[in-house]
């Protein structure tokens, strides 16, 4: 059964070091993403594997009129 959880909640539960290891990134990247308030969700699969997806508006860059 898949479980979906925010990056912040996963890191609070398991620690930033384990979170980084599970996602294949550095701990500093986890810390920076959390402090920046990025909307990142982790899916935990039944086999224990974890992957992350970021949700952000499209288009992400709002163009200003000149």
Swiss-Prot record:
Signal peptide: none annotated. Changing residue 58 to D: Loss of dimerization. GO terms for molecular function: core promoter sequence-specific DNA binding; DNA binding; protein homodimerization activity. GO terms for biological process: latency-replication decision; negative regulation of transcription by competitive promoter binding; negative regulation of viral transcription; release from viral latency; response to UV. It comes from the Viruses. Keywords: DNA-binding, Early protein, Latency-replication decision, Repressor, Transcription, Transcription regulation, Viral latency, Viral latency initiation and maintenance. InterPro entries: Cro-like, Cro_sf, Lambda_DNA-bd_dom_sf. Pfam families: Cro. Plays an essential role in the switch from lysogenic to lytic state and in fine-tuning the lytic phase activation. Mediates the de-repression of the lytic promoters from repression by cI at an early stage of prophage induction. Turns down the expression of the transcriptional activator cII, a factor that initiates the expression of repressor cI, the major component promoting latency. Additionally, cro is able to directly bind to the promoter region of cI thereby preventing the transcription of cI repressor. Binds DNA as a homodimer. This is Regulatory protein cro. It comes from Escherichia phage lambda (Bacteriophage lambda). The lineage of its organism: Viruses, Duplodnaviria, Heunggongvirae, Uroviricota, Caudoviricetes.
């Amino acid at each position: 059964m898949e479980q979906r959880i925010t990056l912040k909640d996963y890191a609070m539960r398991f620690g930033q070091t384990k979170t980084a290891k599970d996602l294949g990134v550095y701990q500093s990247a986890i810390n920076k993403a959390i402090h920046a308030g990025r909307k990142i969700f982790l899916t935990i699969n039944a086999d224990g594997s974890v992957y992350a997806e970021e949700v952000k508006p499209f288009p992400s860059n709002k163009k200003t009129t000149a």
